Amino acid sequence: MYLIHFTKEALFDIEDIVLWYEEQRIGLSYDFELCLEAGIDTILRNPAAFQKRHKEVKVRFISRFPYGIHYRIKEKEITVIGVFHTSRSPKNWSKRI
């Protein structure tokens, strides 16, 4: 069983995304949160299944939304370092590694 932790920055990412989607359409943020939760559940079930994007950082793309959950695995611990838009340059998020 893996433990999952979110960095402070990852939590800010999620908060910003949720607020943005709620401004676009009432209830859309809830849809995003459901898809995010499903992505996290998939990571917890099989964290090694997803591709490496940069060094030891893996990404699980979120269904229906253009975001990826970026995380590292160390022993039985998963650390989510960010939730980034797919169009965002790796140079912008690689600073968090």
Language-model features, listed with the residues they occupy:
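Residues in soluble alpha-helical coiled-coils and helical-bundle/repeat scaffolds
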Residues: 1, 23-26, 44-48, 62
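Basic/aromatic recognition patch in beta-strand/loop cores that engages polyanionic ligands
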Residues: 38, 45-78
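Catalytic cores of transferase enzymes with a strong primary signal for eukaryotic protein kinases
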Residues: 9, 32, 49, 83, ...
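Low-complexity, intrinsically disordered short peptide segments enriched in small/polar/basic residues
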Residues: 1, 11-14, 37-40, 78, ...
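Enriched for short, Lys/Arg-rich terminal
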Residues: 68, 72-97
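Solvent-exposed interaction patches of small proteins and small membrane subunits
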Residues: 16-19, 29-31, 51, 56, ...
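Arg/Lys-rich, positively charged N-terminal/basic patches that mediate binding to nucleic acids
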Residues: 1-33
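Residue-level recognition of specific faces of alpha-helices
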Residues: 8, 13, 17, 39-42, ...
